[in-house]
Amino acid sequence: CYTAQEIEGTPIYYSSPEYQLLDNENMPDAWEGCDGNRQAGAVYDMIMPDPQPVKPYGNWNKTRIVVYNQRVIHYMNDVKVLEFQFGTPVWRALVDHSKFSKFSTSPEKCPEAYDLMLQCGKQPGYIGMQDHGYGVCFRNIRIKEL
């Protein structure tokens, strides 16, 4: 069972970090941002995935997100591609230098998200999936409480 609702002026991506799922080859946004921080596996506009084991367009990619004790790990095709921790000076610096910062000069800036991003990991929340109008398929979605 699900429902989808977009409230004007408050997109879902204002509320939390985003594990970027997209086709690196054919989506222009994958090459925007800085140093690959908008490619598949990234924390959108904040942390680039390294390595980048994404499979080409038309193939299934396996993703996994582990969140435990404010530590977050992203996997792509069973390879760890990044790790970070909420509530640290490093996390704050990432937010401060992203389009979510109150101080951002980016034309895509979202300063409304700043305080929400700094509060991430302090309490349980929601898992959301969004699409920007392009085809996307999901299968075998599992959620396990740690």
Regions found by a protein language model. Name each.
Residues 1-146:
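Carbohydrate-interacting regions of secretory-pathway proteins
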